[in-house]
Amino acid sequence: MKRKLVTSALPYVNNFPHLGNLIQVLSADVFARFCRLKEYETLYICGTDEYGTATETKALEEKKSPEELCSFYHAIHAEIYNWFNIAFDYFGRTSTPQQTEITQGIFNDLDKNGYITEHTIEQLYCPSCKRFLADRYVLGTCPSCSYDGARGDQCEHCGKLLDPTDLKEPRCSSCGAAPEVRSTTHLYINLPKIVPEYEKWMPKTAEEGRWSNNALQMSKSWLRDGLQERAITRDLKWGIPVPKKGFEDKVFYVWFDAPIGYISITKCWADLAGKDWKAWWLDQNDVELFQFIGKDNIPFHTVIFPCSLIGSGKNWTKLFHMSGTEYLNYENGKFSKSKGVGVFGNDAKESGIPADMWRFYIFYNRPEKNDTQFTWKDFQERVNSELIGNLCNLVNRTATFIHRYYDGKIPQVDGAKSGREDIKSMVKSLREAASASFKKITELSDWAELRDSFHEAFALSSVANKAFQDGEPWKRRETDPEYAEALMSELCYLIKDILILIHPYMPQYADQAAGFFGQKIWSGNIFDGKAPQFNKPEGSFLSWKNLGEREGLKTVENPVIIFKTLDNKVIDAYRERYSGSQKDRKKSEKGCSACKDSGSSKSDAAASSAKPEVKLSPAELFSKKIALKTAKIISVERHPDADKLYIEKLDDGSGEERTILSGLVPFLKEDEILGKTVIIADNLKPRKMRGIESKGMLLAASWYDEEEKEHVELLQAPWAAPGTPVILEGDADISDPEAVKAFYAQKPAAIDADTFFAAPILIEDYIPKIEGKKLLVAGKEMKLEKVKTGEAG
């Protein structure tokens, strides 16, 4: 039996984790708990990522040393994860001697094997802080709009993309001193040289390990576009020293050493537990590494980290299964750790809403194949209808009925052995449904398809609820007691099974509900920050092997209400309380009074007198910054160096031919694209793809057929001339073409991808919209043929 090594993305220590960050840690927790219930040998490792520029800068802002800052936020993260009932085997840190030892060892192996190169580059240097500055830590006056607070990578006032040297009167963001241009030499990992060995490993592993589709496609895209040598050193003080002559004053770049943290944190665990860390990481053929990562970090774990391990020449345990999620967005916007926007772990902890209620919604809404939205309205509806109305209702009504009408004693009957066909048929139907669910949930869980697995458990709960309702035990206990007893006995065992199935997701609730029936379930200890937690407590516990068993239940305690429904008043108060940024909330003197109704908060809901920072809604962002227009595709050809890229030439109404590259080869043939009048992202920053510059992006939406095969449909406006602006309903007088052009002309010349995707275009009943407003082309709405709901991009 394969051993399971489980890791989640190491959270960075510059803020509180928000719900989007928590998805990875929680997902790995659910998978590890499932593995323990299956009695696989399991090790779940995580910890805080502590080195790098962001830590140094944050420490300066907070007037702390980097060590003090990391210790402060490490304790906060550990406390939040503890509150969320996350059962790490060990939660460590990357600023340890073990991390230094292993990182330097891997580097030395890479260097010895000829995979390290040197390159000299020019960077801005602050003579006052005595350090080189990353682009975003240079401020100055924008050469385009004269905004004085423009960053060295982009002016957020007008959207213009910049280099630090473009700024007028540039200054260091930390001390205000004028920077100098200096040369510096860095070490690089020669990824192109490692690619041949990587390409022997990746396809087979991705197939055997069933990598999530986004992980597979992103990895192939990186290879298709060509890997470049990547710098692995930085001119910083806070980091792991480089063990190479001439580079003693440099440290390793955080992206290089951070994934090695999985190994070093395992060593920290092993050192305390008296174990051998190499038994999990070196020369082991019976270990499967499951990694849980957000999509922005996928290539570092599917390409860069494996290349580093392969290049070392040693037989490291490498990625087996990659569970990469899409984004969880917040109320039609984006969670932002740096800006403090959204619901954060400390918010959840202080809200009064139980941890398992948060866990329920995160997994019911887990963004496995597409981005999903956290909205307070949906949170309310899912909690009230599924968690409380379905699962809790089943548990409470069954336990209450047994306690009230059978004196708390579960009928000791087996309906499958009844002499009556109607009773045997009822029991057979329930057991067949349960057996099918067990099989499906096990298969899904084995491959970390957690949302579908979770939904399946709730579907089984619905089956049990229907059996209760259809069986009418409140009538039959007097008119047909034999049937009522068989039904209630079967429901008690079915509830026992469902509680085992959901225990990885909601361990606290499942423990408490199982206690109503005199049972215990164990899937992991909560890490206390002091010692490794790998021992199962003494006593008898239910596990996966007990699914389907129909013996052992005797009595039922009088159940208590564990969760309260969330009413509109409560939800409106939460939405108000968690709008804006964390900084705005701290300025508020009063909190959320309606939260008291759910036992969620002791504060009042009055609005803050402090003026909040202006935050653009997706619709406002689109109207102010995002430029879409029509273009006619006049030629299509395959990219000579990329299997999945088309090179499209377009007439965009400007008088000059425009080139856009798209990854549509797997989805559309050339003749399905040629001649179409499509929608393009007009002011998206140009990007080189395999040596050819792509000026913009074609907009399309995807849909899946019954076999889960992905298809793509282009957004089109065949009635419009090339160059026709796309505007949002209500933005300009659509009857006046000049007014539309004038409105369109106010948008910035270039925006980055993050800005573009911060205004999601959702397909609602075949029509592209932003926040419910239609996108119009020459006064007409667009309508897709096959994509009824989804997102365009």
Curated annotation (Swiss-Prot):
Composition bias type Low complexity, residue spans: 591-610
Reactions mediated catalytically: tRNA(Met) + L-methionine + ATP = L-methionyl-tRNA(Met) + AMP + diphosphate
Positions of disulphide bridges: none
Domain tRNA-binding: residue ranges: 622-727
Keyword Transcription: no
Binding-site positions, Zn(2+): C142, C145, C155, C158
Residues annotated to bind ATP: K337
Gene3D superfamilies linked to this entry: HUPs, Isoleucyl-tRNA Synthetase, Domain 1, Methionyl-tRNA synthetase, Zn-domain, Nucleic acid-binding proteins
Placement of sequence motif 'KMSKS' region: 334-338
Pfam families: tRNA-synt_1g (PF09334), tRNA_bind (PF01588)
InterPro entries found in the cross-reference section: aa-tRNA-synth_I_CS, Anticodon_Met, Met-tRNA_ligase_1, Met-tRNA_synth, Methionyl/Leucyl_tRNA_Synth, MetRS_core, MetRS_Zn, NA-bd_OB-fold
Single Gene Ontology MF annotation: methionine-tRNA ligase activity
EC number: 6.1.1.10
GO biological process, one term: methionyl-tRNA aminoacylation
Gene Ontology cellular-component annotations: aminoacyl-tRNA synthetase multienzyme complex; cytosol
Cellular location(s): Cytoplasm
Names of the cofactor(s): Zn(2+)
UniProt feature, compositional bias: Basic and acidic residues: 581-590
Motif stretch ('HIGH' region): 11-21
Cofactor note: Binds 1 zinc ion per subunit.
Signal peptide segment: none
NCBIfam families on file: metG (TIGR00398), PRK00133.1 (NF001100)
Family annotation (PANTHER family): METHIONINE--TRNA LIGASE, METHIONINE--TRNA LIGASE, CYTOPLASMIC
Function, in words: Is required not only for elongation of protein synthesis but also for the initiation of all mRNA translation through initiator tRNA(fMet) aminoacylation.
Stated family: Belongs to the class-I aminoacyl-tRNA synthetase family. MetG type 1 subfamily.
Name used for this protein in its record: Methionine--tRNA ligase
Organism expressing this protein natively: Treponema denticola (strain ATCC 35405 / DSM 14222 / CIP 103919 / JCM 8153 / KCTC 15104)
